[in-house]
């Protein structure tokens, strides 16, 4: 298991695309993709974000066709922490993107893991404050929920 969490390396999800050459020659049995939320803070439209994820999936399938893909929904974030100003007012973009990702996964026969509802405050699109320390990244309790959800799918 290797994590390629890149944070703001390229400030765009295409940074992952550009680094696939580090992963794909090993023809991994499985890849879990949880990408796109950083792009929201860079003012990319939902269509652009989904298109970049689609390009990433196409490249993985071309260069490592036997790799089983798991496309995870974007996680919610919580603006009340005030740390990520560029996400302000954009909470409702996440379910919109997730809806498009789920449709894409269904069209392409890719396993889709809908994590979003596991992490939101009831009746909102906001990340539960007890699952984060900064409003964006999961804390230990958040990771426990994530791991449990992933294990159910594999």
Per-segment meaning from a language model:
Residues 1-10:
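Single conserved hydrophobic/aromatic residue that forms the stacking wall/gate
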Residues 7-8, 34-37, 72-75, 115-117:
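Active-site-proximal beta-strand/loop segments in catalytic clefts of secreted hydrolases
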Residues 8, 38-46, 87-88, 132-136:
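Second-shell loop/turn segments in exported
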Residues 76-154:
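Catalytic His-Asp segment of secreted/periplasmic serine-dependent ester chemistry enzymes
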Residues 46-56, 94-97:
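Charged helix-capping and loop-helix junction motifs
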Residues 64-68:
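A short helix->loop->beta-strand "cap" motif at the edges of active sites that frequently abuts
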């Amino acid at each position: 298991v290797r994590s390629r969490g890149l944070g703001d390396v390229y400030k765009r999800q295409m940074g992952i695309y550009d680094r696939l050459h580090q992963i794909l020659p090993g023809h991994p049995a499985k890849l879990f993709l949880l990408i796109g939320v950083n792009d929201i803070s860079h003012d990319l439209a939902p269509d652009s974000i989904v298109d970049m994820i689609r390009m990433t999936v196409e490249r993985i399938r071309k260069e490592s066709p036997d790799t089983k893909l798991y496309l995870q929904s974007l996680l919610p974030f919580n603006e009340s922490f005030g740390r990520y100003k560029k996400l302000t007012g954009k909470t409702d973009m996440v379910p919109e993107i997730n809806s498009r990702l789920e449709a894409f996964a269904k069209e392409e026969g890719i396993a889709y893991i809908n994590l979003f509802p596991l992490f939101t405050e009831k009746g909102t699109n906001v990340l539960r404050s007890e699952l984060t320390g900064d409003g964006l990244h999961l804390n230990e309790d958040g990771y426990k929920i994530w791991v449990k959800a992933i294990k159910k799918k594999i």
